[in-house]
Structure formats: structure tokens, C-alpha cells
Design a protein with these regions (language model features):
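Positively charged n-region of N-terminal signal peptides that target proteins for export
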Residues: 1-4
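Bacterial N-terminal signal peptides
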Residues: 6-16
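Mature catalytic domains of secreted/periplasmic carbohydrate-active enzymes
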Residues: 21-362
Length: 362
């Protein structure tokens, strides 16, 4: 049994600080954790993204159709017959890239967006000292104009990755922060419409493939459901429905206990609308960029995602087969059936010898 290793990079960027003044005439910053129900919060989020309902519905319909048209079906009995591609079994080293708006502060890590709304965290202190400077209306949205990527050169990155000996490259398409690092037709908050105003993911995909490397991507959209929940407990812009399309529902996270993230005990509110949106966004990524690897974080194992995950896996495997390649899905912990995809250990490794290939990233 071979172990695959994926090295993770977290990139920071510096920027000057410029903010626009809020013109809100009411108090949209007031805490909402105790004053709004989960259903009301979810309704506000749905309304904020309603203009994309047509494209979302199209993508979901496409996923459902392709999921039932090919060698796989959207059920675990079928998906457990999955076979990894030989190139992936033979690969020893890959590059995983964390890079996004959260790089602007050049502090903490990619969980900065969550922790900047939690008063006990260093990111909260950093943001208020260096960016907000006493203005409660400032939030993560105000870091986006500072993320310009003016020195980003995909060809140079790809050349360095090639010289490092990596066989595959997996940049984050969207992290928990909800900002799409790709050209999404389902959001206003994208790297094409704001900040750099260019499709950095698309540029990197082209450059990586030009170097003869395999291209994948990661999606952390599932976790966005709760990521900004700290902002609902304090005065912050997370409470303003005007920004619900960026901050998402920000439902209170009832985290499962235990080091293994036993998600069967996770009681966080997840609506059908959210899992449908998740399916649409990941379908969009596959159709636009044709990744050979799709990496998911642990929260796709939350019980409410089971049906959507099976639908996506069958869609992706069938789509890849129809386009001449074999797709790989990475998952963490116990969030997916071991036989249906490739298990990834973040900052860890398999504790015993098993027949299946697995991956570690650090």
C-alpha cells in the first residue's frame, strides 16, 4: 500500500487599507443569534441569492441527469465499486494551495475570517487593530478590495511546482469564507467580479496542465453554512441581510464532540436549499474546470449532506468517464464511504496497514 503526500501552502499578501463608509440608516449590526430563528436566517440567505436560482436549478438538474447516466449510480452500493486511476496510485507528492482574501492580513491562518468575529481570538484583535480601527461596520467584506493579486503569475507558480517534483496541484476553489476563487455564475462574491478581477483558478489550471501536471481543486462550501456564526453573537456586519450572500446563513455551529469529528452528533441547522446550493456549486466547478481531483473538507459528513454527496460523487465519476478521465474525490475522517473515494489525513496518517490507497497532507 502506498501513501500519497500532499503539501499544503498558505499564501499571504500585503495591502494598503482603504474602506468605504456604510450608509445604513438602521442598526443592521445588532446581534441576531437569539433574535432570529434558524428558518428566518436561512430565508434571508435564500433571498440574497435568489437571482441565481435559474442557473442553480440548471446545474442541479444536470448533476441529477449525469449521476444516472454512466457506470455509476447515486447510491453507495454502486459508488463502492469505484477504482482509483493508476496515475494517482503511483503519485507520491502533490501541492495543496490555501490562497484567498484571508491572505490579506498576513496573520493567523485560513480560519482568520471565522475567528475575526470571535472576541477571544487573535484574529479578532488583529482585525480591529489594523483594519476596523473602531468602526463596528467593518468586516471581512472590507478585506476583499485589498486582495488584488497584482503579482500573481500562474506560469511561474506552475514552473516552481514542476521543479519541486510534484505530480499534482490542488488549489482551493472556495474556502469556508464563501469567496469564490474562480469564475462562478452563482455568486457576486468572486475573484472575477471583485478584487483581482481575473479567473485565478482558471489561469492556474491552464498553467499547471501546460507543465504536464495533474490539476485538482478543493471545495469547502459545506462548512460555509456555519463559518461566520460568531458574528451573530456580537455587533457585526454578519447580521446585516445586505451581506447574506457573502456570509451565508452563519447558523450556530453545534460541533460534534471528539477528535474524529463524529458528525452523527452534529445538530447544526442545514436546509435542503443549502445542500442543493452545495451540489450546484460543485457541479459548476467540475463542468468549468474538469478537475482530476476534488478535495472536500470534513463537513460533507454532516448527516444532512448524505444524499447530495452521493449525487455529486456519481455525477462527477460519470462526468469524468464521459470526458476521458477518472476522477478522484478526497474526503476526511469518516465523512464518506472508504470504498467510494480516497481518504485524506490532515496533519496525520493511517494508523494501520490497509489495502486501499490514502493521502496525507500537512
Amino acid at each position: 500500500m502506498k501513501q500519497l503526500c500532499c503539501v499544503s501552502l498558505l499564501l499571504f499578501c500585503g495591502a494598503s487599507i482603504v474602506f468605504a463608509q456604510s450608509s445604513a440608516s438602521t442598526d443592521p449590526l445588532a446581534p441576531t443569534r437569539d433574535s432570529k430563528s434558524a428558518a428566518e436566517i436561512d430565508r434571508e440567505w435564500r433571498q440574497s441569492v435568489a437571482k441565481y436560482d435559474g442557473e442553480r436549478n440548471r446545474l442541479v438538474a444536470e448533476a441529477e441527469k449525469q449521476a444516472n447516466d454512466g457506470p455509476y449510480r447515486p447510491d453507495w452500493g454502486s459508488l463502492m465499486k469505484y477504482q482509483q486511476p493508476q496515475w494517482y496510485k503511483d503519485a507520491k507528492f502533490g501541492i495543496f494551495i490555501h490562497w484567498g482574501v484571508y491572505s490579506v492580513p498576513a496573520a493567523e491562518n485560513e480560519w482568520y475570517p471565522r475567528n475575526m468575529y470571535r472576541p477571544d481570538e487573535g484574529a479578532y484583535k488583529n482585525f480591529h487593530e489594523h483594519f476596523a480601527k473602531g468602526d463596528e461596520s467593518k468586516g471581512y467584506k472590507d478585506l476583499i478590495p485589498l486582495f488584488r493579486a497584482e503579482h500573481f503569475d500562474a506560469a511561474t507558480w506552475a514552473k516552481v511546482f514542476k521543479e519541486s517534483g510534484a505530480q499534482y496541484v490542488v488549489p482551493v476553489a472556495e474556502h469556508h469564507d464563501g469567496f469564490s476563487m474562480y469564475d462562478s455564475g452563482l455568486s457576486d462574491w468572486t475573484v472575477v467580479k471583485m478584487g483581482p478581477r481575473r479567473d485565478t483558478l482558471g489561469e492556474l489550471a491552464k498553467a499547471v496542465r501546460a507543465e504536464g501536471l495533474h490539476f485538482g481543486l478543493s471545495s469547502h462550501r459545506a462548512e460555509h453554512n456555519f463559518f461566520y456564526d460568531g458574528g451573530r453573537a456580537i455587533r457585526s456586519d454578519v447580521n446585516d441581510p445586505k451581506y447574506a450572500s457573502l456570509y451565508g446563513p452563519a447558523h450556530q455551529w453545534f460541533e460534534a464532540g471528539g477528535d474524529d469529528h463524529s458528525l452523527i452528533n452534529d445538530w447544526t441547522w442545514v436546509s435542503d436549499a443549502w445542500t442543493r446550493d452545495w451540489l450546484a456549486r460543485d457541479t459548476e466547478l467540475v463542468e468549468k474546470y474538469k478537475p482530476e481531483i476534488v478535495y472536500f473538507d470534513w463537513w460533507i459528513g454532516q448527516p444532512n449532506f448524505r444524499g447530495a454527496v452521493a449525487e455529486f460523487a456519481s455525477f462527477y465519476y460519470n462526468y469524468a468517464a464521459a470526458h476521458g478521465y477518472t476522477g478522484v474525490i478526497n474526503f476526511k475522517d469518516y465523512s464518506l464511504n472508504w470504498k467510494a473515494a480516497v481518504r485524506d489525513f490532515e496533519r496525520g496518517q493511517q494508523d494501520r496497514i490497509i489495502a486501499d490507497h490514502w493521502q496525507t497532507d500537512t
